[in-house]
């Protein structure tokens, strides 16, 4: 019996010995293959291990934002010579030729940065939820140049912001906005829902000024209303002295406001380094026929003889996107700390 116990002890010691040897070799191979993963900097190489679980968790805090603005349009007859300075509520009631209505929509991405005391707050870009209060349309002269006389004036009547997936239809309010830096915080209070808990972005804020040429990042967004994650490389780090940078992600409309994540010393060390601001674009005017009712298509063999309209078309320049750095985001939140506090939000608990 004693001999049998002694055999098992020797066997166990041998197993432990080989485990230590192989773990040591594994560590040496790891350090040899990824020598810079412990340098305290943001990684520039593709992650050495899977990150699907972490990215899925992060994605739970990323939401689609939809915004719609409703306008009332007053149309004037040619020759009435109405100028902007003439416009008053009383003038519109007396001199308008006819009234019509239309709406403008936009969509983008927001990230949940706060969920406490039945309140929720999301960070996004200001342009996602911003529409002009008034839109002017001017008559043209015989040379096609715009005159000072108004053809119509469209006044924004109301605006609604929705976050897909939130309770009660997902309507939220604008809590704070900075149009210059293109930042906004949206939120809502759910007094009837006790112990409400939304998935807040689960990783720490980073330092965008520490990003370098070639730093690897992940980005989240909602192009074409689909949640997507993509990868990108940083260029022009800290190009304005405030931490702003460019990425080469192929992003589409709907990515605005989407988070950009750096990785410091390997998975799962994600850090929030910014949000996507804009995609460069150029616009041009193209001629289009009048739209038929029911979206019926015109015949390609019958010559068109109807009215032609000049429509402005946008041409997106894919493969380059501007990013608002976390440094600017923190300045924005601190500047609105008192306002947010009055609304019941504690920015020290954001993120």
What are these regions (language model features)?
Residues 113-178:
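Catalytic-histidine neighborhood of serine endopeptidases
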Residues 65, 110, 120, 124, ...:
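Terminal peptide-recognition signature
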Residues 29-43, 143-146, 153-160, 272-351:
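C-terminal cap/linker of serine protease catalytic domains
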Residues 1-78, 347-351:
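N-terminal targeting leaders that route proteins to membranes or the secretory/organellar pathways
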Residues 125-130, 221, 273-282:
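Short beta->alpha transition motifs characteristic of CBS
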Residues 111, 250-276, 286-290:
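Catalytic nucleophile loop of clan PA
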Residues 46-52, 94-125:
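A conserved glycine-rich beta-strand in the N-terminal activation segment of trypsin-fold
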Residues 45-54, 61, 111, 140, ...:
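Active-site substrate-binding loop(s) of clan PA
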């Amino acid at each position: 019996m004693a001999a049998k116990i002694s055999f098992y002890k020797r066997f166990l010691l041998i197993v432990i010995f080989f485990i230590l040897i192989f773990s040591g070799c594994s560590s040496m191979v790891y350090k040899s293959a990824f020598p810079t993963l412990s340098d305290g900097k943001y990684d520039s190489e593709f992650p050495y291990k899977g990150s699907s679980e972490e990215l899925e968790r992060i994605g739970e805090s990323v939401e689609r934002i939809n915004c719609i603005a409703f306008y009332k349009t007053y149309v004037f007859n040619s020759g009435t010579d109405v100028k902007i300075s003439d416009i008053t509520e009383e003038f519109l009631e007396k001199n308008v030729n006819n009234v019509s209505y239309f709406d403008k929509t936009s969509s983008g991405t927001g990230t949940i940065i706060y969920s406490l005391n039945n309140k929720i707050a999301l960070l996004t870009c200001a342009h996602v939820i911003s529409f002009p209060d008034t839109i002017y349309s001017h008559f043209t002269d015989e040379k096609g140049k715009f005159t000072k006389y108004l053809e119509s004036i469209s006044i924004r009547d109301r605006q609604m912001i929705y976050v897909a997936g939130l309770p009660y239809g997902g309507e939220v309010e604008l809590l704070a906005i900075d149009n210059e830096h293109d930042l906004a915080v949206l939120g809502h209070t759910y007094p009837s829902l006790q112990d409400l808990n939304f998935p807040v972005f689960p990783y720490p804020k980073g330092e965008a000024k520490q990003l370098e040429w070639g730093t690897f990042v992940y980005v989240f967004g909602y192009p074409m209303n689909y949640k997507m994650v993509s990868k990108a490389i940083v260029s022009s780090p800290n190009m304005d002295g405030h931490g702003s940078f460019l990425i080469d992600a192929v992003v589409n409309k709907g990515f605005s406001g989407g988070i950009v994540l750096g990785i410091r010393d390997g998975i799962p060390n994600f850090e929030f380094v910014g949000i996507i601001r804009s995609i460069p674009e150029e616009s041009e005017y193209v001629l289009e026929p009048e739209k038929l009712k029911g979206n019926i298509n015109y015949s390609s063999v019958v010559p068109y003889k109807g009215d032609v309209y000049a429509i402005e078309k946008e041409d997106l320049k894919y493969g380059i996107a501007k990013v608002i750095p976390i440094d600017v985001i923190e300045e924005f939140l601190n500047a609105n700390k008192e306002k947010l506090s009055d609304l019941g939000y504690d920015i020290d608990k954001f993120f």
